[in-house]
From Swiss-Prot:
Entry protein name: Pimeloyl-[acyl-carrier protein] methyl ester esterase
Active site: S84 (nucleophile), D209, H238
Primary role: The physiological role of BioH is to remove the methyl group introduced by BioC when the pimeloyl moiety is complete. It allows to synthesize pimeloyl-ACP via the fatty acid synthetic pathway through the hydrolysis of the ester bonds of pimeloyl-ACP esters.
Database matches in InterPro entries: AB_hydrolase_1 (IPR000073), AB_hydrolase_fold (IPR029058), AB_hydrolase_sf (IPR050266), BioH (IPR010076)
Subunit structure: Monomer.
GO cellular component, one term: cytoplasm
Ligand binding (substrate): W22, S84, L85, F145, L146, A147, I148, Q149, H238
Organism expressing this protein natively: Pseudoalteromonas atlantica (strain T6c / ATCC BAA-1087)
Length: 258
């Protein structure tokens, strides 16, 4: 039995759950929070080892256990949105709880992050280098990761500052969770499993994203069923909800089930 995660719910309306990415916490959703809370009952979740849940470390710290921890606090009939690593967790939660996830919103995420044969993704050397650097200098490594996330965006410096400011109020992530999170990004491949998901799934990708290449759009349209839709933000990198908040919210509102 997993320790219950702390969550925060604000607003009223249909249930909408947000899962953040690697190295940050639920504070990262600040730019879109007020708007969402006007239309939905929004639940903010810090993943195990991050933010307010930085003392909770499931053993082993793997995708299945992360998804189970989130599934335990998932309100019924939820729209589940995940960014980056959080999107990978969201996909696994939907596999565990298909009747409880009304819709998946997948933001700058992928069923497989690492580059492979005929698959665009992150070079494995980059993820391994981050793991090694974490031990030497935690805060500098997270800063470097944030810089890669913003790379390509016209407002890269502002984006990085916004992310840093939004996550500073919460406790720092546990180094073991950060290391295990990189391991998940390096090794997990959910391509076969997500093809079986039946709920509506909306992907939101940045054309300039160096972590989740926009080629993913071709895979979604070619290999996945008609319950999947994709929006590409032409000038965004890995954090479209920060760099292009207005466009992001318009698309999110248009494509989210009520």
């Amino acid at each position: 039995m997993h320790t219950t995660l702390k969550t925060r719910t604000v607003g009223s309306g249909p249930n909408f759950v947000l899962l953040h990415g690697w190295g940050v916490n639920s504070g990262v959703w600040q730019p879109i929070a007020k708007q969402l809370e006007q239309h939905f009952s929004v639940t903010y979740v810090d993943l195990p080892g991050f933010g307010e849940n930085n003392q909770i470390m499931p053993k082993p710290y793997d995708l299945k256990n992360l998804a189970e921890c989130v599934a335990n606090v998932l309100p019924e009939n939820s729209v589940l949105a995940g960014w980056s690593l959080g999107g990978l967790v969201a996909q696994h939660v939907a596999l565990l709880e298909p009747t409880n996830v009304k819709q998946l919103i997948l933001i700058a995420t992928s069923p497989k992050f690492q580059k492979g044969n005929d698959w665009a993704g992150i070079d494995p050397n980059i993820l391994q280098a981050f793991s090694q650097q974490l031990v030497k200098n935690l805060s500098k490594t997270i800063e470097r990761f944030l810089a890669i996330q913003a790379m390509g965006s016209d407002s890269a410096k502002t984006d990085i500052r916004k992310i840093k400011n939004s996550i500073e109020a919460s406790p720092q992530a546990d180094i073991a969770a950060l290391t295990a999170g990189l391991d998940i990004l390096e090794h997990v491949d959910l391509r076969d499993q997500i093809a079986a998901l039946k709920m509506p799934i909306h992907w939101m990708l940045g054309r300039l994203d160096s972590l989740v290449p926009v080629k993913l759009q071709g895979y979604v349209q070619r290999s996945l069923a008609k319950n999947h839709s994709v929006t590409i933000f032409p000038h965004a990198s890995h954090a479209p909800f920060i760099s292009h908040t207005e466009d992001f919210l318009i698309d999110l509102m248009e494509n989210t089930l009520r």
